[in-house]
Amino acid sequence: MLLGALGGCAPRQVVPRPVSGGLNQTFVLRVGQTATIRDRPLEITFKDVFSDSRCPTGAMCIVAGEVVMLLLAQVANNIKDITFHVRPGGDAHEFAGYTIRVTQIDPPKGPPETMIAENQYVAYIQVRAGKATSPIPISPTTPMISPSY
């Protein structure tokens, strides 16, 4: 009888509520949260944060670093895991006729001795119909072309 009473005291896992976003509008997702795009068959879920190499507060860094995160995108039976490398300026990928852009990740990286819990991460996302029209962020493997004088 005591075991049955204790079973009711187990902590419950909190599942974030789904959100609704619109095309060409910024919406916010937490890890585990799903957004449906109004009047479209597209759903986006913020699945995971793999790494966070952003420059810590108060540090002098040569590069800004990035957050590597996973979104799951779905239109009907077309489902795809998409890995984003979010640097200053964001990262964008095309899926099923849409451009999905992660523009920012919060919270900012704190001092080196502090850790950000996975449930604290927030992604700012924009969805557009069609292909990306703005420049794609430069990846570390993309050669940079210097102007010649």
Where are the regions a protein language model picked out?
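Solvent-exposed coil/turn segments that connect beta secondary-structure elements
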Residues: 40-42, 47-51, 66, 74-78, ...
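N-terminal secretory signal peptides
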Residues: 15-63
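Bacterial signal peptide processing site
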Residues: 10-12
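Extracytoplasmic
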Residues: 30-32, 39-41, 64-68, 79, ...
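Short Fe-S-cluster ligation motifs
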Residues: 85-104
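C-terminal partner/receptor-binding element of secreted or periplasmic proteins
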Residues: 105-149
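Mature extracytoplasmic domains of secretory-pathway proteins
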Residues: 50-87, 91
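C-terminal motif of bacterial Sec signal peptides marking the signal peptidase cleavage site
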Residues: 5-8
